[in-house]
Design a protein with these regions (language model features):
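Hydrophobic h-region of N-terminal signal peptides that target proteins for export
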Residues: 11-20
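Solvent-exposed N-terminal domain segments of exported/luminal and surface proteins
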Residues: 21-133
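Surface-exposed intrinsically disordered loops and tails
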Residues: 111-127, 186-213
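Short helix-loop boundary/capping segments
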Residues: 152-203
Length: 248
């Protein structure tokens, strides 16, 4: 099995730990976390420690492939005043699977599915707005072109095997938690119709169908808030599901 190399700067924690392995095809999941100086480092082959959907599948012709993931990030993240939008990988889960909420699809009226990689970049397809088209499995995950299995939403299989709310770390080093409905997203679907592009009612098909409203005890625009006295990010059951920006 070919092995893809992934090397990027992220941030995650826990002192040396190996998770229980399962076999996916002829490959077992491998995940190690360890502290190296001021960094928390992760080594993973990208194979999850839980059952996945069958791939390839309709809407997703890619097969899960062993990866080479080597991630190190700061142990003591600092929250900045301004956030940074993130396209691509946002963080890593406690089983070595990556969080990558965005899609590579954009509105394209000439395409059979009305979206393509070469479409209008003002309208980015939201994967949960086109359910059934991009092959999400029961873990809210699917497979990228390079064979990378990754999460787009609540990682069901991981949560079922994890007794703690901590399910991962973001690229800036802050923790990622899932607390079901105890934390509420500050994002809402816009009302009315889109003024350009796909001229229809805002329905969640595109990321741009949502806007940040906030208020009260809602999470900030990066799906962040306070957990046990510390700033953390949260996976939520509603948009944005996984943070689309980071404050670190």
């Amino acid at each position: 099995m070919n092995q893809k190399k992934i090397f990027f700067s992220l941030s995650i924690i826990v002192s040396s730990l190996s998770l229980a392995s399962i076999t996916h095809g002829d490959v077992k999941s491998k995940f190690i976390m360890e502290i190296k100086g001021d960094n928390r480092c992760f080594i993973s082959n990208g194979i999850p420690n839980h059952t996945t959907g069958d791939f390839p599948v309709r809407g997703n012709p890619n097969e899960i492939t062993e990866q080479s993931i080597d991630v190190c990030v700061p142990r003591s993240p600092k929250r900045n005043k301004e956030s940074t939008p993130i396209r691509g990988i946002v963080g890593i889960a406690m089983n070595g699977v990556l969080f990558r909420p965005s899609t590579a699809g954009y509105w394209d009226p000439t395409a059979r599915r009305q979206h393509s990689r070469n479409g209008d970049r003002r309208w980015n397809v939201e994967i949960f707005g086109v359910r059934g088209q991009l092959g999400l499995d029961f873990n809210n995950a699917h497979v990228g072109r390079g064979g990378l299995y990754h999460y787009h939403g609540v990682p069901t299989g991981l949560i079922e095997s994890n007794s703690k709310t901590l399910i991962g770390y973001a690229g800036d080093g802050f923790e990622i938690h899932y607390v079901e409905d105890l934390k509420t997203s500050g994002w809402e679907l816009k009302s009315g119709e889109r003024p350009s592009g796909p001229l229809e009612k805002y329905d969640g098909t595109y990321v741009e169908d949502y806007h940040y409203v906030g208020g009260g005890d809602r999470l900030d625009k990066c799906n962040g808030g306070i957990h046990n006295g510390n700033y953390s990010y949260f996976i939520t059951n509603t948009f944005p599901f996984i943070p689309r920006c980071l404050y670190g």
